[in-house]
Amino acid sequence: MQRVRERLLFSPSDLGAFLACEHLTQLELAVTLGEGRRPGYENSYAELLRSKGQEHEAAFLATLRAEGRSVVEVRLDGRRDFEAGTRRTAEAMRAGADYVYQAVFFADGWRGIADFLERVDRPSALGPWSYQVLDTKLARHPRPEHALQLSFYSQALGHTQELSPDLAYVVLGTRVRVPIRLADVTAYFRRVRERFGAAVTARSRTSPYPCDHCAFCDFRDLCEDRLEQEDHVVRVARIQRGQVKRLLVVGVDTLTGLAEMAPGTPVAKIAPSTLDGLREQAGLQLIRQRTGALEWHALDLEPGRGFAALPPRSPGDLVFDLEGHPFFEPARGLEYLFGVLLLDDEPRYQAFWAHDHEGERRAFEGLVDLVHARLERHPNLHVYHFSGSEPSTLKRLMAEHSTRDAQVDDLLRRQVFVDLHAILRRAVRAGVPSYSLKEVEALFGFVRSGAVQSGTQAILHYERWLHQKADGLLDEIEAYNREDCRATLGLLEWLHRVRPTDLAWPEAPDPRALSPEATEAMDARQLLRQELVDGAEPESARWLAGELLEYHRREARPAWWAYYDRLGKSPEELLEDTEAIAYLTVDRDTPPEAQRRSLAHTLIFPIQDHKVRPGTPVHDPATGRTAGDIVEIDDTSGALGRVRLLRGPSLASRPLPEALVAGGPIDDRAQRAAVLRLAESIRAGDGRYPALRAILARERPSILGVAPGGSVQTTDVEAMKALALGLDSSYLFLQGPPGTGKTWTGARLVVALLGRGRRVGIAAQSHKAIHNLLGEIEKVARDAGVVFKGLKKSSGSSDSEYAGPFITSDDDNARFEQAGPDVQLLAGTAWLFSRPGLDGRLDDLVIDEAGQVSLADALAMGTAARNLIL
């Protein structure tokens, strides 16, 4: 944002800042208009991120040049003349460079610099080519502000070349190019830009509110001072943004006002118990503000939470704390220090350092091996940590490095990890501004003395060490990590001191050990993987078949972890979880309704955001078991939501749930078994699945009438039909970006196959995509005079059912496995075509939108057919 000759000029980054914090826009506007000054705040972490972003951009540029691409660089001159830069950008585009770097755009009071313009073969006013925008971002995933920037650049680009591009790309730190379909975000861009313009024109009165952008903001200290001066209610520990908004509606805008609110005062959409907790929290903080006394009190006991979740001490206990650099490389971070405090007779600190990804793997293995070795001597030990980041990081490292899978799974099953932060928050309420480790240390008198005082400082220290290699920097980081471990130990000891003495210790968890049969199957799978991988060339068909054996188990792990994490959440946390419904109570006005041997119970709940729907498998978090079947849910027609829960005889004696959580991942045993069949076939070399092996080996398609190695690239539909009909135990890819007619083409290929008496399967990632293709197939078949009979697999829900002149739906898998030759078309998802009863039963399998299907699922489905069209 700048003012030039009394005119305000804006950039796409101003839109991103507005999206992050509307108050920031008003602060920037005041500085631009000379009504305020920018604080002299030095933000080293923000500078580090800017530097890393520039490294990523420079590396991408170097790659383009190394590939021999022609790159024209447009640089602003010292006067930062955007109009001249815009002219030079247009000249580079007219010259037809492969890439234009630092492309400048200026129009209608907006200006910006796009990282790259990429030439594509699409005619425009420039000639037989045009350009699309690429922007490099250090992020791991695209964010809304990226779409705003790309929309601005693409709109300006469209004016220059007199052709609007269809796509723009975010080049992430991982080097993955993520396409943004501009038609999908144009309305969003226009709406945000209009809101931004209105806010600038009206000089809207805004207030600061803590957000993610604060860590990088020049005005952070200014905002914190204002919040303190105003005694803003946002300063109440653990209060959420939605709760702040609801309190403001009833006139409660200060911490003092909340603390002095009369008990029982209702606030819409805040549960009474939650409001009482917030009021008590504000009261404790107010006491500390006025007297300096840090008071606390124990919360009411809850089964399995707070003090009731604190296990007894064991001689083998450990405390664990991690230090990581999130942007060690643009593509990935580095966990550079694994610190452990061994709680023997005399606590002993041990550090596992890592300065590259191989070192990270060794440090991770060293930590896991250390814990397992102590477990053999002390089977009841626990690993204490503060916050959930440590276990989640270990899970990620296990997946990234493909090592110690079984050992980490074993630790998780045994519930070895104990999050003292979660226990503290449900055990006590204290007059602290937050429940971070640094703030709660005052409860047990821990005082830090190290040079490094925060995780951000540790990252900056480590970044300096990477450039200077001064060992003193590592010593200071290690001292900080050691203090974190000792502070966590101090919290553990304090919790044990204040724990109610008459409270029984929690029972040791059931480790959920695998059955002997499951263990035997897993061992056999591991042995098969080893046989395939050992000695095989990486990325070869044999190697890939071995690595894919574990794909579905790896994919299911995060869903299981999220599920078990959900089981341990408090009602307040479940209220904010979209995979759950919290605060359920029985609807006294609606008695249970008998349905055969089951009862349909009606429960009510406060309106909340959730994704739970009829048919969603739901569990009771109190038991970790099924809560019944949701047959109806209504949260749009009243002040309270209603859910009808059908419970059979086995649930009759159990209490009705007080919350519902989505179950674990969908059963994928059929897909796992199909991939296993393929892997066994490749080990045996029996040639059972030649098309699948050809895909893994990246062999050219084998087509009757086409010479080996001959071209199979064509845009002619009749030629495509001939290729599909000539498939000889092989595969074809239909390629093209969204909206280029792949479904239209696929339908015509399917009808051609059906017309020749072939038995065809239709698959996709979703029922909606399948229905879309089936509708086109029936239309084409009618026009071509092709008559056939088809079956579509449904799951029992209405949105999975399809009915047409040739195709009917059925939810019984046996009907598909037993279907005779009169049924020429079968349609369904991976759960259908992976079944052993369909192995080899089809001539051709067409997988629509195959780009959205994992390789493992495509291969699992492919076991049903001789040929694949993807």
How should each PLM-predicted stretch be described?
Residues 840-854, 869-870:
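SF2 helicase catalytic motif II
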Residues 759-845:
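Conserved P-loop NTPase motor core of helicases/translocases
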Residues 123-127, 143-182, 384, 406-482:
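Active-site-proximal helix-loop-helix substrate-binding element of RNase H-like nuclease domains
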Residues 645-730, 782, 794-818:
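Pre-P-loop entry segment of helicase/translocase ATPase cores
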Residues 1-125:
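Metal-dependent nuclease catalytic cores that hydrolyze phosphodiester bonds in DNA/RNA
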Residues 244-330, 373, 538, 550-578:
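Long, highly charged low-complexity segments
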Residues 12, 29-69, 500-623:
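Accessory interdomain/linker segments of ATP-dependent helicases and helicase-like nucleic-acid enzymes
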Residues 87-193, 334-339, 344, 349-365:
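Mg2+/Mn2+-dependent nuclease catalytic core
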